[in-house]
Design a protein with these regions (language model features):
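Substrate-binding clefts and catalytic carboxylate motifs of secreted carbohydrate-active enzymes
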Residues: 1-124, 136-137
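Extended low-complexity, serine/threonine- and proline-enriched intrinsically disordered segments
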Residues: 51-60, 145-160
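Short, hydrophobic beta-strand segments
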Residues: 75-81, 171-192
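Short beta-strand elements
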Residues: 98-106, 206-219
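Short, solvent-exposed loop/turn segments enriched in Ser/Thr/Gly
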Residues: 123-129, 195
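Short glycine/proline/serine/threonine-rich loop/turn segments at secondary-structure transition edges
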Residues: 192-198
Length: 219
């Protein structure tokens, strides 16, 4: 970690103060989940333009902090991990914004989603399909990885797959890959033939429901 605990105040502080001002084009890894070993000391960062933010764990306040107190403009708390709900409540000009993270279970399924439910059958239009590992309650699982495969039927051109990791070296021209933060991306291109492209995903005992993308001739 780039942080250590200030024993006098119990707050996280940088191991090398001011290093963030000198580091170019790099950033430390961050996780968008609340799943860690019990009592693991975790640095919680909150990115916000609110004047102050209160952090709560399972309804208990862990203190309110002010943006002006953080030179790098990132709120920070040192929190021993306890399963449950982590909530940040920000206040700005009397208005409140809230963001929560919950402890999730083991992956039990795959959820597929896309913004492009219909695309033109012009041989150029593209559809992006995101596969996300989810637990039994449908919560995104972002702390575990699985290898998943996409199954497709219809007229399409496979442009590739990716998981968003900057160090990903898996085969782009494939219908399977290992997730990163529980996610993977499938990119398809239409042909000039109208079609219904039916997509599902499976892997390591997990499966998804089917989704359909319609390619159509434009009028």
């Amino acid at each position: 970690s780039i942080y250590k605990i200030d024993e006098a105040r119990g707050n996280p502080v940088e191991r090398n103060p001011g290093a963030w001002e000198k580091a170019l084009w790099v950033w430390h890894d961050v996780n968008e989940h609340w799943n860690y070993p019990d009592d693991c000391m975790t640095i919680v960062e909150v990115y916000s333009n609110c004047e102050e933010v209160e952090l709560l764990l399972n309804g208990q306040s862990l203190g309110t902090k002010h943006l002006a107190d953080f030179e790098d403009r990132i709120y920070k708390w040192a929190v021993p991990f306890t399963a449950g709900t982590l909530e940040a409540r920000g206040t700005k000009a009397g208005k409140q914004a809230t963001l929560k993270r919950i402890t999730v279970g083991e992956p039990t399924g795959i959820q597929l989603s896309t913004y492009e439910e219909t695309v033109a059958a012009d041989g150029k239009s593209v559809a992006h399909i995101v596969a996300q590992l989810v637990d039994e309650n449908g919560n995104p699982v972002k702390n575990q990885e699985r290898e998943i495969s996409f199954n497709l039927r219809g007229d399409y051109r496979l442009l590739g797959v990716d998981n968003g990791a900057p160090d990903n070296v898996q085969d782009l021209q494939s219908n399977s890959l290992i997730t990163d933060q529980g996610r993977s991306l499938l990119i398809l291109q239409s042909t000039e033939e109208p079609s219904s492209i039916i997509i599902s995903a499976q892997g390591e005992g997990l499966s998804s429901e089917e989704i359909t993308i319609i390619t159509h001739q434009e009028l």
